[in-house]
Amino acid sequence: MDFAIRPVRDDDTKDLVQLSLLAWAPVFPSFKQMLGDGIYGLIWPDWRASQREAIEQVCKDGDQTTVYVAELDGTAVGFIAYVLNLKDKTAEVQLLAVHPDHQNLGIGTALNAYALNRMKESGVTLARVDTGGDPSHAPARRCYEKAGYTALPLVRYFKDLTER
């Protein structure tokens, strides 16, 4: 499969929103099952709206966020977004998504490698990414481990203070 990786364009936003909603659809039911309806509803009352807003923000935030798109036959099939902190020589991957029809074909791996090379060319010495520890994030963890990231297990706790 021959795909190209290129910088995001203004006309990509709508496609990247749709792609990300499909790619992350399995994640939110997993979160809901783990957290329960109460806490889940407090964090993500409408996960689709939250994701749409996040994607729209990174696509228009060219001064702060770098976004690259994987394109196959003129169609966006994946993307990666990261932020550079040149003062600290660090970078953080904020988002990585591959359309479900194109997952497990090396697109996420290629996007990671491409972004890591651009980071290194910018003088970055340390890259980081956060991802979930739940079963729905297993493919993401494999992708990051394949790219050479080292995991630091963390636990995040939530407490619903609206309960009596």
Regions from the language model: what does each represent?
Residues T109, T125, G133-P153:
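Conserved active-site alpha-helix within GNAT-family acetyltransferase domains
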Residues L105, S122-T125:
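Short coil/turn segments at alpha/beta junctions that flank glycine-rich nucleotide-binding fingerprints
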Residues M1-D2, R164:
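Basic/polar N-terminal segments that are highly enriched at the extreme N-terminus
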Residues K146-A147, V155-R164:
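Terminal substrate-recognition subdomain of acyl/acetyltransferases
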Residues Q103, K120, E145:
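Short polybasic/polar patches that bind polyanions
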Residues Q103, R128-A140, F158-T162:
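Conserved beta-strand-loop-alpha-helix junction that forms the acyl-donor binding cleft
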Residues F3, P7-Q94, H99, N112, ...:
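Acetyl-CoA-dependent GNAT
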Residues H102, G106-Y114:
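Conserved acetyl-CoA pyrophosphate-binding loop and the N-cap/start of the following alpha-helix
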